[in-house]
C-alpha cells in the first residue's frame, strides 16, 4: 500500500470551534502553571520494560528534587506492583508535606475501592477518574450513547464521595478527565463535566480538577486553545475548578498546544520529563518549564543539573534522549557552522554578568542548567575561524590575531576535510603546535643574547641550520625584534605583531604572533610561546620565517 493521491477519501480535517471573539491570541503566559508529572503512570505504562519499584522510587525522588508538587505515581488497581509502590511511598515517608501524590482509576467500583485503599494513611492525595467521551470511543469501543457515557462518569463520581468519606484523615482532591476531550463535541464534554461537578460540589476553597486531554493529538494547537477557552467560559462553577491540560504529541505540537492552552485560561499542565509517554509521548515538562524560564518567568522547577536529571530518566526509562531534544540534547548548545560560531564567540565576548542574555544562537545560558561552554562550539569541515578561535581562547588562553585566524582556519579546514571527522580543542591545539610552534627548519633558534646601549638594542642569536651547522647572527635596532630582523641574512618585512599573557601570576607565559613577508613573498604568520616575552617574540619570528621558506620551497618544487 502507498500513500493516497487523494487522502480526503480516508481522512478528514478536524472541525474548527466557532469562537469569533477568542481572546487567547492576545494573551501571554505570565506565571508557571501547576505542574503534574505523569512519568510514573502514563510514562511508565508506555515503556517496553516498565520500571521496577527501585527505579520508580529513584524517579520519584528526582521529581521531588526538581520541585514537582503533584506526581501521578501509579494505577494502583492495575497491578500489585503499582499498589505496593503507593504503599511504600506513604509508609516509608517519601512524600514531602508540600507534595501531593496522584493516582488514576477507571470508573468501576472494585477499581475505585482498591485505589482508595492504596492511599490509606496519606496526608493528602489526588484521585483521578477518567472515561472516554469522544464519538469514536462511544461507538466503537464502548457501544454506548451519550447518556450511557455520562452515567458512567456520574456514578463513579458518587463512588469517589463514598470512599473518600471512609478515610477522613486524608485531604482529598478529586480529578476528572473526559478522556479524548479534544476529539469530543464541546457541548457534550461540558455536559459530562458539569454533571461530575454537581456530584462533587466543589467550592473556591476546595476545588476539583478537570483535566482536558488531547489524548490523541488530532488538530492544530490553535483549535485546542479554542476548545480550552470555550470550555473555561462555559463550564459551571469555574471559580471552583482547576482546569488542567494533558497533551500528547502525535502531530508534534504538544508543547505549542499546552502553551496556547495556558494562554486560553488553563491553570495546570500534566506531562512527562523529556516527553516520554504513549506513542509519540506526553508533552515535555522540561521544555515547557525552560520555555518559561527563557522568557523571564520563574518556572518553579529547578533544572540546574539538567544532565543529572536526564541520566536518571534515561536509566529508568531505558530510552535515550535525542541529541537534538530542546535544552538537554547533546547537540542543542553546539555550533558547527562557521558563521554561527563567529556570532556566538562575539556574543560571549560582549556578554557581561548581570546583563540580559543576548548571545546569538543560544536562547539560554548553558551554565544556568549546569552545562559547560566546552561543547558550545565544535569544529568540523563546516566550521570557520570563529569556532577555532573560541576553542583556543577558552581551553588554552590563546587569542589569535584576526588575519592569523583566517590563515589557521584554512589549515584546520584542510585537516577536517582529510579526516572527515570533528576536531576537538586538543586536536586543534596539537595542529597549531605542529604547524607553528614546531616550525624549526631550516633555522632553529638555540639561544640569544640581548644588550641595551644608548636606547638601542644589540642582539646575537645562535641558530641551528641545515646539516647540523651552527650559525651566529648579529643585529642592532630600536628594539629587540628590530635588531633581530636587522641581523637576518634574509630580507624580512614585519607586517604585524601581537602579544598577550597566557595565565596569571608566576606561572604565566607570553604568546607572541608575527606576520611577516620574506623577499616580496606572501604574508605568513608565526607563533612563539615562552616564559620570557622577548624569547617568545624571537620564536614567533623564526616560526614565521621557517614557514615562509618552507612554503616557497614547496611551491618551487
From Swiss-Prot:
Annotated segments matching region Regulatory domain: 439-557
Compartments where found: Cytoplasm
Gene Ontology MF annotations: 2-isopropylmalate synthase activity; acetyl-CoA C-acetyltransferase activity; magnesium ion binding
Transmembrane segments: none
A GO CC term assigned to this protein in UniProt: cytoplasm
GO biological process: L-leucine biosynthetic process
Keyword Zinc-finger: no
Cofactor: Mg(2+)
Binding positions for Mg(2+) per the UniProt entry: 42, 246, 248, 282
Known pathway: Amino-acid biosynthesis; L-leucine biosynthesis; L-leucine from 3-methyl-2-oxobutanoate: step 1/4
Matches recorded under SUPFAM superfamilies: 2-isopropylmalate synthase LeuA, allosteric (dimerisation) domain, Aldolase, post-HMGL domain-like
Quaternary structure (record): Homodimer.
Family: Belongs to the alpha-IPM synthase/homocitrate synthase family. LeuA type 2 subfamily.
Protein name, per record: 2-isopropylmalate synthase
Organism: Pseudomonas putida (strain ATCC 47054 / DSM 6125 / CFBP 8728 / NCIMB 11950 / KT2440)
